[in-house]
């Protein structure tokens, strides 16, 4: 019998001056004793020509009494506007996967981003960067391409897709998709899907509740 598992957001405190931020917690549609939990936060602030962006995700999944997924992702990015559409990037990322040979990966890269489209309802940006990645095994060169898409489907409904691919000794693909409904009080209800390939493919869909600030 299917069960719907929802983790409820208890509290969040974010200093004044933040913009376009949200925190969400959620669970997955599960069968029998399978269960999944998901947590994420996004922070975005613009100051003059600078844009500061933080993103974090955590996903945990069990099948029966066996843990099959335990992953974390953290990204800190500084963008500096060069033109109306182009910008320079400085990027620090960390991701953890308990079941990967190199369970910890940290990368530091620089690059260039371009705003492909900006309208009242749709935003598309593409970024490419080069740098160094360190894992449990060694240092290696890495080239990263990311494509970000956001579309306001209706007044209260937003669709977001973030695609990222690393070209290194081993290819890493990550795609996060969200569909959110926002209430007047800042409460968010939504559904999200997280797909990763590194090299094992993992895919989980969760139903989330959260708050925007």
What spans do the regions from the language model cover?
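Repeated loop/turn-to-beta-strand initiation elements of outer-membrane beta-barrel proteins
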Residues: 21, 48-54, 84-88, 119-124, ...
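Residue-level signature of outer-membrane beta-barrel architecture
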Residues: 43-45, 80, 94, 114-116, ...
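Detector for outer-membrane/organellar transmembrane beta-barrel domains
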Residues: 109-111, 115, 119-165
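Outer-membrane beta-barrel "beta-signal"
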Residues: 180-182, 188, 202-213
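Short glycine/proline- and aromatic-enriched beta-strand/turn motifs that initiate or cap beta-hairpins
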Residues: 18-58
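Transmembrane beta-barrel strands of outer-membrane/channel proteins
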Residues: 25-29, 54-58, 76, 90-94, ...
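Solvent-exposed loop/turn segments connecting transmembrane beta-strands
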Residues: 28-37, 62-70, 97-104, 133-141, ...
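Hydrophobic, lipid-facing positions within transmembrane beta-strands of outer-membrane proteins
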Residues: 35-41, 72-76, 92, 106-110, ...
């Amino acid at each position: 019998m299917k069960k719907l598992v929802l983790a409820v957001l208890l509290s969040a405190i974010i200093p004044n001056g933040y913009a376009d931020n949200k925190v969400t917690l959620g669970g997955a549609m599960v069968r029998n004793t399978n269960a999944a939990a998901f947590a994420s936060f996004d922070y975005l602030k613009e100051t003059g020509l600078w844009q500061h962006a933080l993103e974090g995700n955590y996903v945990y999944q069990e099948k029966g009494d066996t843990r099959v997924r335990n992953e974390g992702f953290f990204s800190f990015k500084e963008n500096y506007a060069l033109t109306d559409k182009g910008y320079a990037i400085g990027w620090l990322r960390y991701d953890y996967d308990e079941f990967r040979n190199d369970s910890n990966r940290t990368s530091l890269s620089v690059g260039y981003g371009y705003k492909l489209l900006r309208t009242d309802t749709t935003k598309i940006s593409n970024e490419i960067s080069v740098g160094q990645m360190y894992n449990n095994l060694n240092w290696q060169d890495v080239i990263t391409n990311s494509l970000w898409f956001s579309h306001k489907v209706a007044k209260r409904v937003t669709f977001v897709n973030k695609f990222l691919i690393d070209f290194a000794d081993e290819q890493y693909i990550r795609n996060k998709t969200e569909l959110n409904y926002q209430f007047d009080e800042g409460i968010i209800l939504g559904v999200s899907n997280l797909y990763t390939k590194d090299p094992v493919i993992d895919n989980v869909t969760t139903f989330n509740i959260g708050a925007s600030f």
